[in-house]
Amino acid sequence: MEKYHVLVVEDDKEIRDGIEIYLKSQGYEVFKAADGIEGLEIIYREEIHLAIVDVMMPRKDGIQMVMEMRKDYDFPVIMLSAKSEEVDKILGLNMGADDYVTKPFTPLELLARV
């Protein structure tokens, strides 16, 4: 049986690696990127089933990345952000995200949304 492929796009290495460790322990195949440009490169070459994308990143932020990938791909996207204002959540959802998780979050909260 093929594993479910999750892309984690997060510029904070500690958070990125923590999500990877937890999702792998739950049986997911995890691909990682440090910014939106790397994330798009992985999307174009791998079969991704779900992306977990930070909003604020260098080079290409999460909103820009999701807007670009939505031109060709429709798999679910969970946005991560330290911004917890309702307007930020609405912006993320309007730009193509399926869910929005504010930092800090627990592994169980993220898994429930995956």
What are these regions (language model features)?
Residues 1-114:
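N-terminal/domain-start alpha-helical segments
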